[in-house]
Every structure is written in C-alpha cells, then in structure tokens.
C-alpha cells in the first residue's frame, strides 16, 4: 500500500529493494544489503483520507512509519516521514496547517534536535510521543521487541 518494489542494477548485477516514494518523485530504498535513496531526496506525506486532518504524525524514517501502522498508531491522521533529520526544513511547508503535530522521532541527539526545531517553529502544537517507546532507540525497535515478547 505504501511501498513498492524497485529493481536496479549495479555493475551488471540485478538487485531489488523496497521503495518508499517522497513528495518530489524520489524514493527511499532499503534492502538487506543497501540503504539509500533515488534522488531527489525529500519528505514523504501520507494522507489516509480525502478529508483534511487536524493532526499529522511525524516520523524520522519510513520503517518507523510502517511500524506505527503495524501498531495501529496514527491510523486516521496524516503522516509525514522526514526520510532524514536534515529534511526538517523541507517539512515546514507541509506541517503549517495542522493543529497538532505528533512526533515519533528517534531517542537520540538528532531526534531531540529535530523535536526542538519543530517546537521552536510550532510551539505547543508539537507533541513528543517518544514516551511510548521509552527504552528503545525508535518505534521500529519497539515493534520488534513487542513482537518478540508476544511469541
């Protein structure tokens, strides 16, 4: 639903990877052997409904977005995937119209800086949701631990 298969070649060898599209026509790509992008690099915006949402969930990477979907988090809200904390400036034009911005960012220095940058721009509209996965690096790690504990 959110991803596609991308086929590519390097030095005559054929490979495939998961592709996650961004708003500029590029893709974030992941495989067992490779993590990168097909330019241009930009944010990804997912709107599950035709009607406008007042809430947008923000994720650092698409694996965290997919983890949230698997956990049933933010299903009715719009979602913005930064695809790199360096893209926080590109996110601003997409986040302006939301009344609440729920941040599911990594529990590291880059995630904290990104959260502070968003709070500096949007103030009280920004909500830090990382307490949900406290003790984990990110939402994807939390999902993996949760799934492992349920086995």
Predicted regions and their residues:
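Short, small/acidic-rich helices and loops at N termini and domain boundaries
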Residues: 1-10, 141-147
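Phosphate-handling DNA/RNA-contact segment within nucleic-acid enzymes
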Residues: 6-94
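TOPRIM fold recognition
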Residues: 54, 70-151
């Amino acid at each position: 639903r959110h991803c596609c298969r991308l086929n590519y070649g390097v030095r005559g060898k054929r490979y495939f990877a998961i592709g996650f599209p961004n708003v500029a026509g590029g893709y974030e790509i992941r495989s067992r052997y490779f993590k990168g992008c097909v330019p241009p690099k930009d944010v990804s915006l997912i709107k599950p409904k035709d009607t406008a949402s007042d809430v947008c969930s923000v994720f650092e990477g698409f694996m965290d977005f997919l983890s949230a979907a698997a956990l049933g988090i933010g299903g009715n809200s719009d979602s913005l995937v930064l695809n790199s904390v360096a893209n926080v400036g590109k996110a601003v034009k997409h986040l302006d119209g939301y009344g609440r911005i729920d941040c599911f960012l990594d529990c590291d220095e880059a995630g904290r800086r990104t959260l502070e940058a968003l709070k500096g721009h949007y103030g009280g509209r920004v909500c830090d949701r990382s307490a949900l996965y406290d003790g984990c690096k990110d939402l994807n790690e939390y999902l993996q631990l949760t799934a492992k504990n349920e086995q």
